[in-house]
C-alpha cells in the first residue's frame, strides 16, 4: 500500500466571495488537488481555462508587476509554489463539472475532437506545471457516449505518456454513485487508463426530492427508507464487484457542505423550502454549520449525520466529525484508496486543518494515522516545456 490519497477540489471561483486562495489550502495534509474547472469547446474538443484572471493573471501581493517575459500568475503560480514546498502534493486540472458537462457530448463526440481534447489538455498540464488531468463528465447518457469516454481516456493517457518524460502524469475521473448513471459506464475498459476514480458519494438528497433525506449516507435505512434514496456501499460494491475496479483505485468523495430542508420533522419526512444557504440556495458551507439553535445527530446504522432545529424545523444533511470517523473506518476496512472532498474552501480548521478544530480533512488524516500514512509519491516540478518563463525557471524570485 503506497499510502492513502487525500484529494481536495479547489475551485477557481473560491478567490472571489469566499476569499479563499491556494495559499489557504491545508497543503501538508493533501496528496492531490483537483483544480476546477477547465471547459471544453463543443465544436472542436479544445480544453481551455474557464477564468483566465483567476487561473493565470491575478497578481498576489508577492507577485511583481515588473517581470520581463511571458509569465504566469494567479492560482496557477500559487499552486506551483505550494508544490515546491510540499513535494507530495500533486495538482490535477479538472475538466468539466456539472455546469460544463453538456459540452462533452459533442466535445468528445468525434475522433478528431477527442484527439484535440487530449492534445490541448496535455499542453495545459505542461504549460501550467500540473501533474495530470481529472475528467468530470456528468454523465455519459448512453452506450455511445460511454464508448466515447473510454476512447477519450485512452487518448488522454497516450498524450500524457508522450509528454511526461521523467515525470509521472496522472489521469483520474469523477464518477457517479447513482445506479442510473454508473450502470452506463464501461468500467472494465476505463480502468487500465486511470490512476484512480473519485466517487461522488454525495448529493443523494436535495431540493429535487419530495422528502427531506440524507445526502451522503453509507448504508440504506431499513427503518426509514425514504430518508436514503441512495447509499454509498451499493455504489462501491458495483464498482468493485461488477465493474472490476481494484478497491485501492476508488477514492471516496465526501461533502464539505450541507443540504438544507425547511419546515420538516426530519429525515424521510416532507419539507417545504430549502432556505438561503451560504453561497447558493439550500447549501451551507460546513464551516457555517451547525446553524444557531441546531443540534448535530448521528445514525451509526446508516453512517449519516445531520443537524436539526426543532424550533425552526430545519434539517441540514452534512458530514460531522463523527460521520467522518465512520467513513474513515469504512475506507480502511474496504481497502479503498483514500478520501476526496468537495470542496476545500468550506472546511473548518483553516490551513492546519486539525480534527480538534472540526476539520473533515484533518479528521480523515488523523484517523488513518497521520500524514506519514498518506501517499508520499512526489510531484513534478520541472517543466522545461512550459510557455511561461517564470514557471519554466522554477519561480526563482518568489
From Swiss-Prot:
Subcellular location(s) of the protein: Secreted
GO BP term, example: chitin catabolic process
Matching PANTHER family: CHITINASE, ENDOCHITINASE B
Gene3D superfamilies, alphabetized: 3.10.50.10, Glycosidases
InterPro entries assigned: Chitinase_II/V-like_cat, Chitinase_insertion_sf, Glyco_hydro18_cat, Glyco_hydro_18_chit_AS, Glycoside_hydrolase_SF, Glycosyl_Hydrlase_18
Name of encoding gene: chiB
Matches recorded under SMART domains: Glyco_18 (SM00636)
Induction: Expression is increased at the beginning of the stationary phase of growth and reaches maximum in the early autolytic phase of growth.
Record-given protein name: Endochitinase B
Amino acid at each position: 500500500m503506497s499510502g492513502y490519497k487525500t484529494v481536495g477540489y479547489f475551485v477557481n471561483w473560491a478567490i472571489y466571495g469566499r476569499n479563499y486562495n491556494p495559499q489557504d489550502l491545508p497543503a501538508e495534509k493533501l496528496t492531490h488537488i483537483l483544480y476546477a474547472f477547465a471547459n471544453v469547446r463543443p465544436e472542436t474538443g479544445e480544453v481551455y481555462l474557464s477564468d483566465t484572471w483567476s487561473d493565470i493573471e491575478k497578481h498576489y501581493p508577492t507577485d511583481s508587476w515588473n517581470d520581463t517575459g511571458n509569465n504566469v500568475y494567479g492560482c496557477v503560480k500559487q499552486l506551483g509554489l505550494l508544490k515546491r514546498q510540499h513535494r507530495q502534493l500533486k495538482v490535477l486540472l479538472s475538466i468539466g463539472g456539472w455546469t460544463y458537462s453538456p459540452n462533452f457530448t459533442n466535445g468528445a463526440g468525434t475522433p478528431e475532437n477527442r484527439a484535440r481534447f487530449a492534445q490541448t489538455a496535455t499542453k495545459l498540464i505542461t504549460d501550467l506545471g500540473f501533474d495530470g488531468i481529472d475528467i468530470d463528465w456528468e454523465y455519459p447518457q448512453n452506450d455511445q457516449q460511454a464508448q466515447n469516454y473510454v476512447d477519450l481516456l485512452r487518448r488522454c493517457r497516450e498524450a500524457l505518456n508522450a509528454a511526461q518524460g521523467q515525470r509521472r502524469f496522472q489521469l483520474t475521473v469523477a464518477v457517479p454513485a447513482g445506479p442510473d448513471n454508473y450502470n452506463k459506464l464501461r468500467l472494465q475498459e476505463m480502468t487500465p487508463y486511470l490512476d484512480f476514480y473519485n466517487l461522488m458519494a454525495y448529493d443523494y438528497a436535495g431540493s429535487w426530492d419530495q422528502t427531506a433525506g440524507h445526502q451522503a449516507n453509507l448504508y440504506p435505512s431499513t427503518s426509514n427508507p425514504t430518508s436514503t434514496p441512495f447509499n454509498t456501499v451499493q455504489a462501491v460494491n458495483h464498482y468493485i464487484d461488477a465493474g472490476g475496479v481494484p478497491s485501492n483505485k476508488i477514492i471516496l468523495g465526501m461533502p464539505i457542505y450541507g443540504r438544507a430542508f425547511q419546515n420538516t420533522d426530519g429525515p424521510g419526512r416532507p419539507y417545504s423550502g430549502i432556505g438561503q444557504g451560504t453561497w447558493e440556495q439550500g447549501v451551507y458551507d460546513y464551516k457555517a454549520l451547525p446553524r444557531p439553535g441546531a443540534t448535530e445527530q448521528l445514525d451509526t446504522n446508516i453512517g449519516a449525520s445531520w443537524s436539526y432545529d426543532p424550533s425552526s424545523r430545519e434539517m441540514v444533511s452534512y458530514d460531522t466529525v463523527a460521520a467522518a470517523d465512520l467513513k474513515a473506518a469504512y475506507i480502511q476496512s474496504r481497502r479503498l484508496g483514500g478520501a476526496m472532498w468537495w470542496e476545500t474552501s468550506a472546511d473548518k480548521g483553516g490551513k492546519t486543518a486539525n480534527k480538534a478544530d472540526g476539520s473533515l480533512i484533518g479528521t480523515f488524516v488523523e484517523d488513518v494515522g497521520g500524514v506519514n500514512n498518506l501517499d508520499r509519491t512526489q510531484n513534478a516540478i520541472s517543466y522545461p516545456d512550459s510557455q511561461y518563463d517564470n514557471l519554466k525557471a522554477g519561480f526563482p524570485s518568489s
